Amino acid sequence: MSGMTLTSQRNLQINFANPYIVIGQSVLLRNGLEGEIKSYKDLNNPKYTVVSKLGTTGDLAAKRYLSKAKLRLFETESEGAIEVVNGKADAFIYDLPFNAVYSSQNPGKLVHLDTPFTYEPLAWGVRKGDPDFVNWLNNFLTQIQGDGTYDKIYAKWFESSAWQKTLK
């Protein structure tokens, strides 16, 4: 399962099931800026270089909320985050879950401003014209939320970092 932010524009192209989680954009900040930058709003200045992944809601959020900052876009999340670690950019704007994991895997190399500054419901995307599948997904989500399965999955992947050890 992959995250896709449910937006009005995307909803013109595909249908969405009900959201299964709500996330938002957060900031990975270059070391040395933590006293100067306390919020994403502080980055809206031409002296700062902000990076994000091309074509994502991070890209859109940076353009919308940080229009005065210099913006550079990358093909992958990792390329953008590495720019911040290497001091070539001041901040990386991207999905909170990615930024939380990346900062925990790179302790002392950057600062995570972990309060999301956007509202982004994630949902499964389904091709137009398949209401039965959307209905099935919605019923499935309701079932696992009601029987405790959703809470167990959420705890494993979002409240614990034990799974990260299996990545190495």
Where are the regions a protein language model picked out?
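Acidic, polar ligand-binding/catalytic clefts
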Residues: M1-D42, L110-V111, T115-F117
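A ligand-binding cleft/hinge motif common to bilobed small-molecule-binding domains
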Residues: G3-Q13, A61-K63, E83-N86, D90-T118
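A cross-domain feature marking catalytic cores of carbohydrate-active enzymes
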Residues: M4, L54, Y154
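Periplasmic-binding protein-like
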Residues: V22-L29, L96, A100-T142, S160-K168
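Bilobed "Venus flytrap"/periplasmic-binding protein-like clamshell domains
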Residues: S26-A81, L96-F98, P131, W136
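Ligand-binding clefts/hinges and TM-proximal coupling segments of bilobed small-molecule sensing domains
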Residues: T57-L71, H112, T142-K168
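Conserved active-site loop/cleft motifs that coordinate metal ions or position small ligands
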Residues: I93, G125, I153-Y154
